[in-house]
From Swiss-Prot:
It is found in: Cytoplasm. It comes from Methylobacterium sp. (strain 4-46). It is an enzyme of class 2 (transferase). Its main location: cytoplasm. The lineage of its organism: Bacteria, Pseudomonadati, Pseudomonadota, Alphaproteobacteria, Hyphomicrobiales. Its EC number is 2.8.1.10. Residues 245-265 are annotated as: Disordered. GO terms for molecular function: thiazole synthase activity. 1-deoxy-D-xylulose 5-phosphate binds at residues 167, 193-194, 215-216. It catalyses: [ThiS sulfur-carrier protein]-C-terminal-Gly-aminoethanethioate + 2-iminoacetate + 1-deoxy-D-xylulose 5-phosphate = [ThiS sulfur-carrier protein]-C-terminal Gly-Gly + 2-[(2R,5Z)-2-carboxy-4-methylthiazol-5(2H)-ylidene]ethyl phosphate + 2 H2O + H(+). This is Thiazole synthase. InterPro entries: Aldolase_TIM (IPR013785), Thiazole_synthase_ThiG (IPR033983), ThiG (IPR008867).
Amino acid sequence: MTTPTPLAPDGDDPLVIAGTPLRSRLLIGTAGYPTQAIMAEAVRASGAEIATVSIRRVSLRGHGSDTVSLLAGHRFLPNTAGCETARDAVMTAELAREALGTAWIKVEVIGDRETLYPDVAETLEATRQLVDAGFVVLPYCNDDPVVCARLADLGAAAVMPMGSLIGSGMGVANPANLELICRRSPVPVIVDAGIGTASDAVIAMELGAAAVLLNTAVAKADDPVRMARAMRHAVEAGRLAHGAGRIPRRARAEPSSPQLGLVGS
């Protein structure tokens, strides 16, 4: 007997990545919080099922780290942060699979240290090699529809275009590109990087993103736990608004109340 796919809390279809249904469309990072205890509380407040973790902060002997033990029950998405070549990213992914027992990997291959822009050629090559090695690959990339299409063609389980520069808090810098990517992509689009506050997450979801991944916006907020809760509601609101359909923009007013029967008419 087939187990029914669980619906999200609002009755929406769940996010599905590589055949795995997820109730939350928010993915959250675990770096940069004031304390590990605040990190764990914020992750729980966000409602996220997936937490990203840098393999550099996880024991390779299999004993785990504070992050892993504090977030028991969550699905971990290790990343290749700090890698600058496909070779390094593949090696880091192999270490992550050994340390965490997961084939899921967020590929980050940085091409410029000042802007933290991804290296497109190396990201494509890392994705190709890791897909061939049996990984579930979620690559971080620039907001280029062609690059996202190439990554999907290579077998990426989702694509993760940047909203804006990592840690910048500038929100969605290129909504036209992002909307095009979301409309065309055959795999889920997860907006990654640049989210600064809840309204940024709403915009990303309204443009058609399947999910949002964020870290700094919560970790560096004055109250990370409260911001995590805000992000949870923002992602849900943006998803609902996208499905509901916004009214067209007009350059003129249009009354919402009927004009018939007005006094003096």
